């Protein structure tokens, strides 16, 4: 016997409940009343960001975005969208201040100056880390969820979206099912935002759950895809993937080969 489907109506439907989806919801909520986030993981789990350090690369006001972009062009041998990176960097300080306003605490020295760690041997690309170190991802998830709750953004977990619904050329919703009960779900919306990870091979931070549904949904609905050559692939040692090295090395961590050599 077929289960009766759940039907939801909203102004904006956001597929993906990680940090990107949360920020999309907060922005959408500035313009419309009803915003709904659906995620195939547990409700409010925070996506991959919840397992991050909660640290942040920021273009502080004393720097120029073009100078940071020049470093990235050098680092990536030019294989980067410079205009997109510059826009992200230009907006990064506003997001940094938003996080601080929500209660996210970035480390400072005794004089109150922000502490940072240079990235990949570059001078200006610096990340500003959460205090206490190592618990920032969980705290970022907590404060984003609190803000979503304050703004009455609805969230539903364990929803696997299988297809987007179109009305002519416009996307008007999505269909899927509840991953635990199998109940079909229909979501009707005036706008749909895809904020799901693209997936990859041998990813870290539980990326095995990111199967690329977001890109597949967009492609199935007629969207053009680009940068697919940069889908994530990690060829890393069997016993140690690289997570955390940026923070560990300044604290004295060492990498040794099989002979015990540094």
Can you annotate each of these PLM segments?
Residues 98-104, 126-131, 247-248:
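Short, charged low-complexity intrinsically disordered segments located at boundaries
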């Amino acid at each position: 016997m077929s289960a009766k489907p759940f039907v939801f109506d909203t102004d904006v439907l956001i597929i993906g409940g990680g940090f990107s989806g949360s920020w999309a919801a907060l922005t959408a909520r500035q313009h419309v009343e009803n915003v709904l986030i659906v995620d195939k993981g547990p409700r409010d789990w925070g996506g991959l960001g919840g397992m991050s350090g909660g640290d942040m690369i920021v273009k502080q006001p004393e720097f120029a975005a073009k100078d940071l972009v020049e470093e990235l062009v050098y680092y990536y041998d030019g294989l980067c969208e410079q205009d997109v990176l510059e826009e992200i960097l230009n907006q990064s300080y506003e997001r940094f201040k938003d996080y601080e306003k929500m209660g996210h605490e970035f480390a400072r020295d005794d004089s109150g100056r922000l502490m940072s760690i240079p990235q990949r041997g570059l001078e200006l690309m610096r990340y500003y880390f959460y205090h206490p170190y190592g618990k920032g991802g969980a705290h970022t998830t907590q404060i984003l969820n609190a803000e979503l709750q304050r703004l009455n953004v609805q969230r539903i977990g364990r929803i696997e979206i299988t297809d987007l619904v179109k009305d002519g050329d416009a996307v008007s919703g999505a269909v899927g099912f509840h991953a635990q009960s199998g109940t079909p779900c229909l979501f009707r919306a005036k706008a749909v935002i895809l904020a799901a990870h693209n997936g990859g091979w041998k990813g870290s931070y539980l990326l095995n759950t990111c199967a690329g549904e977001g890109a597949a949904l967009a492609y199935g609905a007629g969207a053009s895809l680009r940068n697919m050559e940069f889908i994530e692939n990690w060829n890393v040692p069997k016993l140690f993937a690289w997570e955390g090295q940026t923070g560990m090395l300044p604290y004295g961590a060492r990498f040794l080969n099989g002979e015990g050599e540094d």
